[in-house]
Amino acid sequence: MKRLHGFVFAALTAVLAPVQAAEDSPASSAAATVAPLHAPKAARKKKAPPAHDPAAFRYVNIAGFGEVAVYKPAGESRGLALFASGDGGWNLGVLDMAHEAVGLGYWVAGFATPQFLKALDAAEGECSDADGWIAKLSDAIVRAFGLPIDTKPIVIGYSSGATVVYAVLAEDAGHTLGGGVSLGFCPDLLIKKPFCPGRGGLTQQKQQVAPFGYVFDKRETVQAPWRILQGEADQVCDPKFAPAFVEGQADAKAVMLPKVGHGFGVPKNWMPQYRDSVREVLEAKH
């Protein structure tokens, strides 16, 4: 099994800020080097990764989510995708995934899953209303950027974000969310308190060994279209969970990827299937 991860909205604000220019990410260095015969030159400092994605349209600060990267499609808008990152936050691999969704016509609002889970744990109540927070994030983006008020967002997530996608879809039971796509899915999160059942009766089990997170039960209450892209070479999330969790759902499919590990490091091995999955969810909700 993979890593265990780690509302009432007291306040929800959106402050528009310009996208900051950033340097390109550095190329990876060689794994090993031969010791030089002469004294080595002073080590060259590596460039820091970009603080912001230059492709983002705006960054907004939203209570409970922190800084959210917002992307605007070039042509006519076809919907809104709320994108939950993996444990690493909003950077690196998830950016390509977000850019692809934008290319299909979505507005995309990308947020750091660790920040989101931390805020849920810190909120009042015995359980976390994750579905409700996601709905309020959608409302904030819709109002800030003038999207149609009846926008029904989809949710996309990678790694721990993929788990969030399942949980909120199962909680929501098809009421406010239009569908979802999970990349690298397994059913556990490092959280301190459980998610609320929601309309769909979501349940989970407390881990009895460290680090004492929660493992979500399979609930056949995902009423919106759901796609899981699962690497067959994934050594973090057991690939068996993907087909098991989609079975019995209203419109769900596990797309197994033979040459893909948990890192989704080679886009040619998964990007076409990801594109097709996002397109399927888009078309199913129209």
PLM features: residue spans?
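N-terminal cap/lid segment of alpha/beta-hydrolase-fold proteins
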Residues: 33-76
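Short, surface-exposed "cap/lid" segments of acyl-processing enzymes
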Residues: 74-106, 110
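Acidic beta-to-alpha connecting loop that harbors the catalytic carboxylate
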Residues: 84, 232-234, 259-261
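Alpha/beta-hydrolase active-site loop
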Residues: 124-147
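Primarily recognizes the serine-hydrolase "nucleophile elbow" in alpha/beta-hydrolase
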Residues: 140-212
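The feature captures the conserved acid-bearing segment of alpha/beta-hydrolase catalytic domains
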Residues: 190-248
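Catalytic histidine-centered segment of alpha/beta-hydrolase-like enzymes
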Residues: 260-271
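Catalytic active-site module of serine/aspartate enzymes centered on a nucleophile-bearing elbow/loop
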Residues: 269-286
